[in-house]
Amino acid sequence: MFKLIASDMDGTLLNENGQVPPETYELILALREHGVHFAASSGRRYDRLCEFFAPVRDKMDFVAANGAQVYADGKMVGREVYSHLAIRKLAQAVATFPNLHLALFDRTKSFLLDDESKFVREVDKDLPNAERIWELPDPSVNIIKASIFCDDGAVMDSAYVLQRELGQFFTFAPSGNAWIDAMQPGVSKASGIAQLAEHYGIGRDEIMAFGDSMNDYEIIRFVGTGCAMENARPALKAVADRVVGCNRDHAVQQELRRVLESLA
């Protein structure tokens, strides 16, 4: 029996328009009534995820910023921040590649270290209040997420090069078709879900997770039942326990219904 279910957002739980299908909220509440916790596991920050789940935000859990922010029932149970040294080295490396552009995030703000118009347009779709800067934030600013926008779509090649250059400080994972997440070593969606599992006293075999991209790799490998979307990257589907349908067909919601039916 599953006691904790985690789902990625873009390309997984969200539909093709980047929206939460309305039935999702009822499913989350129904799962909770049966003793099953639901967690959104995403590269997005906690504050952004709360906007997606406003009707049920206090009745669910969050593994946000790729595991750097972990919340259970609205209470923080884990947080990880980047060292200023690591961020400085990342900024220096990214600056050498004309196709790469760095975005940094603290708990509520987004910082764009670039003035390239294409980059700004892309980021503004999701972060309308982002602040454009030309120097790194002060070391007193707690950075919880770092992402790199790849303006030519060469995310796999770029992630490989960055990993070779900065593997001591980061783990790089493609996220979608244009982004690369720069994660702290040992911090991932898997480490975040592990904190939730410890908080609730839940075993790995009692956890199910859904994902579609390479920043879902660790969590899909960690949980007892890892499910890759039909639209997932081939490497993720290869290591998943199951492959389910597409996000545009609300496949995650269908799987949640099946879990509920098994509990009836």
For each feature predicted by the language model, list its residue ranges:
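Active-site phosphate-binding/coordination module
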Residues: 19-119
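Conserved acidic, metal-coordinating active-site core of Asp-based
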Residues: 93, 98-214, 218-222
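Asp-based phosphoryl-transfer active-site loop
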Residues: 2-17
